[in-house]
Amino acid sequence: MDTISGYLGTHHRRCDQLCIDAEKSVAAELWDRADAVFQEFCAALEQHFAMEEEVLFVAFEKAIHGTDGPTAIMRVEHNKINSVVFMLRDALARRAKNAFLGHADTLNIMIAQHNQVEDDIFYPMLDRMFGAQKHELIEAMRKIAESPAADPAT
Ligand SMILES: [Fe+2]
Ligand SMILES: [Fe+2]
């Protein structure tokens, strides 16, 4: 995967698929499977945000000499997404099927809007901006993706 768009776009789709699997498991009341898949989703999302916030956004902010551009908005959106994930985790722990599915609808809309801006505008812009240096950024992100995920319950 030799572009930021390709690498992170693929990761977006992986997160989406895990979220769909978790919803399907909850809808079918397959709770053990839902626990396992939701945990995998949380870990993937946490790694995704870490790749963006600790590598990509930092490189962008350094290049534009500022932190109050689009990355500030995206960091706020990550926090909002995380607060909905927290509600999903709580609903799952309570085996509250309808609450989980309701929060999942909200989450899907928030993530779709956020990812659309990244996929269509932000990542392609970074691919152009960083030229050959993008390979170093992808390598740094890959290291985060391959590191063991923190326990999402902590
Ligand atoms: Fe993001
Ligand atoms: Fe993203």
Where is each model-derived feature located?
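Small-residue-biased structural context
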Residues: 1-154
